[in-house]
């Protein structure tokens, strides 16, 4: 799976709570052009969490398409994700978009890729972007060895990723569904 530079997005679930967070750094090549971008948001009346890694304009196009799928399928995350992935695979314009989405509701956490894949990682941890592997490793260790809330796991994991990945900073946005 191709990783896109310029961000870290992480989702963690524990008990009845799920959180999704990301950093705010936007880069153009090797230059930081913005430090406080908001790459994480709530969708479908606050019932769905979503974050993106990749080109900003591409991600906003995908957010719009995904929101339309959520509306069409009454907020059904799995069905909306599969329908978006189908469109992404078959539509010529969408196939050119370079972004990935991490999405979550109260029951599922998914990665939607431009290859038409809809993945539900094990252990309720989703990570995308250039710092995703660092954040995922930190989150897994924190989930297995602490009682921290999903929000706190994400905050600490993104901080670790920001220390290690040059495309990830310490300006975080975290959304939670309790």
UniProtKB/Swiss-Prot annotation:
The active site is at 7. Signal peptide: none annotated. GO terms for molecular function: metal ion binding; threonine-type endopeptidase activity. It catalyses: ATP-dependent cleavage of peptide bonds with broad specificity. Keywords: Allosteric enzyme, Cytoplasm, Hydrolase, Metal-binding, Protease, Sodium, Threonine protease. GO terms for cellular component: HslUV protease complex; proteasome core complex. It comes from the Bacteria. Its EC number is 3.4.25.2. One of its GO terms (biological process) is proteolysis involved in protein catabolic process. Allosterically activated by HslU binding. InterPro entries: ATP-dep_Prtase_HsIV_su, Ntn_hydrolases_N, Proteasome_sua/b, Proteasome_suB-type. Its main location: cytoplasm. A double ring-shaped homohexamer of HslV is capped on each side by a ring-shaped HslU homohexamer. The assembly of the HslU/HslV complex is dependent on binding of ATP. Belongs to the peptidase T1B family. HslV subfamily. Protease subunit of a proteasome-like degradation complex believed to be a general protein degrading machinery. This is ATP-dependent protease subunit HslV.
